[in-house]
């Protein structure tokens, strides 16, 4: 009798994706973040579902419904903070996952990479709309500032903003639709993830050496299932430590003040994981220019496969490119810091220089480094 795992139509799909999947024998811990993102997504959907049972998307009651969840719902506080800090964990894993793709040349799987970019945009949109829902000061003003950026689009900008708002300002209609989108988007992310994996399994995984590993494959289970479970345990440990000891560490104190359209907070800023993009947006004095820079700061990932000049796939044996990669990491950390600072000297000029460096690394330095390394290796 043949194994049901290999014959049943549904079990067969799971088997070919998670059990008998041939995987390279040398993939490192940097390959753990894909599965960790899956864990984060499931956690966010589960906690979000329970929060949605008690949340009301009305401007008069949204803030007090969050208070009600934290005070009156059984373990509501832990569900709320797991959801809020789970988003931070999600983005940490996302940045690591994208960084891994850049370092080891995984972007050459263009279909997988492009679906990944769409996923990144979708997750960012979901997180932004989720931040608006508690209807605190930073929620309201963050929504106002970011949605207002659409008005920079020539000719249709103003109409577009009012269409998104559902009125002439951020109000009840905006909150209601943001809640609706915030609820549906994770399921769209889930579907896109399935497509992401579908394309990945067409080519198989990349590995640290960047050399095809067809001659040296091992089954995904038990080797990588154990490895992924260890990663998930460490992620859970980090998240529960954050939730139980300092749940508000990554949040903004202003969001504990109910939204007030008549009082602007001194420093409007998004959650920490958007600060790098926010710093790039602010570094350009022109509104449309800033919006374009903001969009291209993420969209630039789509043209990276076209700018790959090296004869080697990954950066494992390319010291010049390695230096540039870590310069990029340092630059992103600098931008994150600048995004949280007020718009004044010297932060403005640091932000502008860091923004220029960010685009220069991708568009100029990386391709040149690839050409230099090709010549150095005398191929």
UniProtKB/Swiss-Prot annotation:
Keywords: Electron transport, Heme, Iron, Membrane, Metal-binding, Mitochondrion, Mitochondrion inner membrane, Respiratory chain, Transmembrane, Transmembrane helix, Transport, Ubiquinone. Heme b b562 binds at residues 83, 182. Its main location: mitochondrion. It is a multi-pass membrane protein. It is found in: Mitochondrion inner membrane. Its cofactor is heme b. PANTHER family: CYTOCHROME B (PTHR19271:SF16). Component of the ubiquinol-cytochrome c reductase complex (complex III or cytochrome b-c1 complex) that is part of the mitochondrial respiratory chain. The b-c1 complex mediates electron transfer from ubiquinol to cytochrome c. Contributes to the generation of a proton gradient across the mitochondrial membrane that is then used for ATP synthesis. Heme 1 (or BL or b562) is low-potential and absorbs at about 562 nm, and heme 2 (or BH or b566) is high-potential and absorbs at about 566 nm. Belongs to the cytochrome b family. This is Cytochrome b. The lineage of its organism: Eukaryota, Metazoa, Chordata, Craniata, Vertebrata.
């Amino acid at each position: 009798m043949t194994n049901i795992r290999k014959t049943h139509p549904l079990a067969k799909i799971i088997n070919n994706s998670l059990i008998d999947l041939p995987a390279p024998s040398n993939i490192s811990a940097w390959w753990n973040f894909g599965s960790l993102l899956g864990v984060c997504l499931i956690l966010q959907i589960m906690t979000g579902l329970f929060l949605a049972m008690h949340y009301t998307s009305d401007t008069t009651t949204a803030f007090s419904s969050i208070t009600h969840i934290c005070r009156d719902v059984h373990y509501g506080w832990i569900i709320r903070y797991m959801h809020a800090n789970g988003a931070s964990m999600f983005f940490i894993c996302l940045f690591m996952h994208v960084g891994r793709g850049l370092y080891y040349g995984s972007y050459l799987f263009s279909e997988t990479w492009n679906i990944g970019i769409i996923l990144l945009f979708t997750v960012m949109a979901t997180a932004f709309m989720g931040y608006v829902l508690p209807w605190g000061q930073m929620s309201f003003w963050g929504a106002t500032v970011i949605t207002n950026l659409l008005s920079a689009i020539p000719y249709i900008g103003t109409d577009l903003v009012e269409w998104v708002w559902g009125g002439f300002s951020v109000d009840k209609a905006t909150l209601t639709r943001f809640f609706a989108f915030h609820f549906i988007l994770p399921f769209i992310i889930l579907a896109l993830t399935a497509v992401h994996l579908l394309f990945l399994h067409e080519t198989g995984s990349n590995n640290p050496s960047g050399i095809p590993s067809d001659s040296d494959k091992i089954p995904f289970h038990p080797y990588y299932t154990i490895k992924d479970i260890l990663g998930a345990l460490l992620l859970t440990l980090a998240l529960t430590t954050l939730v139980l000891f300092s749940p508000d560490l990554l949040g903004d104190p202003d969001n504990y003040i109910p939204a007030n359209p008549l009082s602007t907070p001194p420093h409007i800023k998004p959650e920490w994981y958007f600060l790098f993009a926010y710093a790039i947006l602010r570094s350009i004095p022109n509104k449309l220019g800033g919006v374009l820079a903001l969009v291209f700061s993420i969209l630039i990932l789509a043209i990276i496969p076209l700018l790959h000049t090296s004869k080697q796939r990954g950066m494992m044996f390319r010291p010049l490119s390695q230096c540039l990669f870590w310069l990029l990491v340092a630059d992103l950390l600098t931008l994150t810091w600048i995004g949280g600072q007020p718009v004044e000297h010297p932060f403005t000029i640091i932000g502008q220089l860091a923004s220029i460096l960010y685009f220069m690394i991708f568009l100029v330095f990386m391709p040149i480094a690839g050409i230099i390394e090709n010549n150095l290796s005398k191929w």
